[in-house]
From Swiss-Prot:
PANTHER family tied to this protein: KERATIN ASSOCIATED PROTEIN 3-3-RELATED (PTHR23260), KERATIN-ASSOCIATED PROTEIN 3-1 (PTHR23260:SF3)
Record organism: Bos taurus
Molecular function via GO: structural molecule activity
Gene that produces this protein: KRTAP3-1
Family (UniProt): Belongs to the KRTAP type 3 family.
Keywords: Acetylation, Keratin, Repeat
UniProt modified residues of type N-acetylalanine: A2
Keyword hit for Mitochondrion: no
Descriptive protein name: Keratin-associated protein 3-1
Region entry 4 X 5 AA repeats of C-C-X(3), spans: 3-59
GO CC aspect terms: cytosol; keratin filament
Domain of life where this protein originates: Eukaryota
Length: 98
C-alpha cells in the first residue's frame, strides 16, 4: 500500500497532480485535472474531501493550460507558493478525512 499524505490526494480517474498550499495546513486536498483544453483562462480547483472553506483554495487564474505531471515549467504561477506532487497507487483515493 502506498503512503498517502493525510491532507492531500489525487483524483481517481487518470494521472493527476494535487496542489496543496505550502504556507498553511489544509486538511482538504485541492485536485486539478492533469490536462485541460487549450486557450482556457481559469482553472476551477475541486475539493476531494467533504470539507467547508477555507479548505478550498480560490480560483487560480493562469494564462494557459499545461500538463501538470510533466517536466515543462509551470507558467503564470509566479508569486504563488505551491507544492505539487503525484501520488500513484493510493487505495482509498480522495477519501474524506474530516
Amino acid at each position: 500500500m502506498a503512503y498517502c499524505a493525510p491532507y492531500c490526494c489525487s483524483v481517481p480517474t487518470g494521472p493527476a497532480t494535487t496542489i496543496c498550499s505550502s504556507d498553511k495546513f489544509c486538511r482538504c486536498g485541492v485536485c486539478l485535472p492533469s490536462t485541460c483544453p487549450h486557450e482556457i483562462s481559469l482553472l476551477q480547483p475541486t475539493c476531494c474531501d467533504n470539507c467547508p472553506p477555507p479548505c478550498c483554495v480560490p480560483d487560480t487564474y493562469v494564462p494557459t493550460c499545461w500538463l501538470l505531471n510533466s517536466s515543462h515549467p509551470t507558467p503564470g504561477l509566479s508569486g504563488i507558493n505551491l507544492t505539487t506532487f503525484v501520488q500513484p497507487g493510493c487505495d482509498n483515493v480522495c477519501e474524506p478525512r474530516c
